[in-house]
Amino acid sequence: TVDCSDYPKPVCTLEEMPLCGSDNKTYGNKCNFCNAVVDSNGTLTLSHFGKC
């Protein structure tokens, strides 16, 4: 699981650490993923680490 409690953040770094979301979309890093989780009102979850 990914802890998104300190998100959303206004700016994400370009750090490459891909995660695959339950929407079958690859997120570049935890920050991008967590911002999307917050935007989805918690409906988006982690499928697995790495690219989809």
From Swiss-Prot:
Gene3D superfamilies: 3.30.60.30. The keyword Nuclease does not apply. Avian ovomucoid consists of three homologous, tandem Kazal family inhibitory domains. Its main location: secreted. InterPro entries: Kazal-type_SerProtInhib, Kazal_dom, Kazal_dom_sf. The keyword Repeat applies. GO terms for molecular function: serine-type endopeptidase inhibitor activity. Transmembrane segments: none annotated. Keywords: Disulfide bond, Glycoprotein, Protease inhibitor, Repeat, Secreted, Serine protease inhibitor. One of its GO terms (cellular component) is extracellular region. Disulfide bonds join C4-C34, C12-C31, C20-C52. It is found in: Secreted. PANTHER family: SERINE PROTEASE INHIBITOR KAZAL-TYPE 7, SERINE PROTEASE INHIBITOR KAZAL-TYPE 7 SPINK7. The record marks L14, E15 as: Reactive bond 3. Pfam families: Kazal_1. PROSITE patterns: KAZAL_1 (PS00282), KAZAL_2 (PS51465). Residues 2-52 form the Kazal-like domain. It comes from Scythrops novaehollandiae. This is Ovomucoid. Glycans are attached at N41.
